[in-house]
Amino acid sequence: MPAFAIGLYDIWDASWRPAYRGAVDKLVTKHGGRYVARTTNPWEVLEGAAPDITNITMIEFPSMEHARAWYNDPEYTPMKRLRQTGSRLDFLLVEGSS
């Protein structure tokens, strides 16, 4: 079953982004993932309060196992640290439907 990694970012210093994106894009592909959404564009809140975020990312993986393997890949660890220098992230992993 597919799985979706959903990132809700609050970015206050984007200087880390060029290095992060280049490396992480390769790791996403390595683990069978693909970006479904990656936006700083406006989004619409249909119900409830708008989260205090500046960016949303959604990555589809073939399975929860693929998504976890990507997130726990040792090559991703330094990228997580880099991202944390200029942002706060709430990251969710959601199993899709077949």
Predicted features, each with a name:
Residues 1-98:
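Conserved, structured core segments of small domains
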